[in-house]
Amino acid sequence: KNMPLIAVVVISCVMLLPFLGLTDFNTKGEPREAVVALSMLNSGDWILPVNNGMDIPYKPPFFHYCIALVSLLTGSVDEYTSRLPSALALIGMTVGCFVFYKRRRNAQQALMGALLLLTSFEVHRAGVNCRVDMVLTACVVGAMLLFYRWWERGSKGFPLLAVLCMSGAVLTKGPVGFVLPCFVMWVFTLIRGGRFWRTSLTYGGFALLSLILPALWYVAAWHEGGQHFLDLIYEENIGRMTGSMSYESHTHSFPYNFFTLSTGWAPWTLLLIFSLFSKPWKRSAASAEAASASEASAASSAKSASSDKSSLPGGLKGKLMRWQIRLM
């Protein structure tokens, strides 16, 4: 009965874990993140460590905490320990998506979706890199799936795990960690007949609650970094969204998002093309809501990506996962 789940776990681990330390850091982004964890361990400053004697981190600390904690166990910060959090995040997201769709469709389709997710180029690449994107994606996707489960159960109780996932996402890369999950579920709930003001207040409240833990770090970092920290936060968040950064960072046109989406899902983009000429698959009533959630998620994510003047390929990983589930 549990063989498909065991297969997903084993395949994910075998595809990722043995290979993380085989190559040196090969982009400027990887050592930039790893050195933050190294500075934390060397200086003992876990709030706002100074890197190379002059720089403060460009991103919130959750990803760096993960690297530092893993490196404490091995005794050093190296390529393997720096990439391990991304790999574990991808494994967790793959397993989580499998369990989610197995309960709402069947084991065969859930297994297919999990393997498509794990082997798509952009997702797999992020899972073996020392960058914040994979941990951010896992937290955002986790929040969406948990919010959906909460909605599915009649919106009863409090979705604590979903809120904690958003907190982790905010502590990984900033406000996008709560904006995207709440916006997606807000759109989905309205599509499913939810009342506008009630839905808006509900997800607005969840967004505020998800900021409690990140606020503790932001306040502590502000006390330590002062105006320089505030200027950096403004540029990395507001400046990045409005295209007013003092330097160009991954600035691309709107069509670039779709080009990245198609190449990032390689080699499975061919399946999407071939499916255009096949007969529509029958949908069961049990999966109608899940399909609607995927559609709302993909559309909302595309909107958020187009509004970001410096959208990264890593920001499209959530859409890759949801689009391949729709293809199934």
Each predicted region: which residue ranges?
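Membrane-integral, polyisoprenol-dependent glycosyltransferases
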Residues: 1-293, 299-328
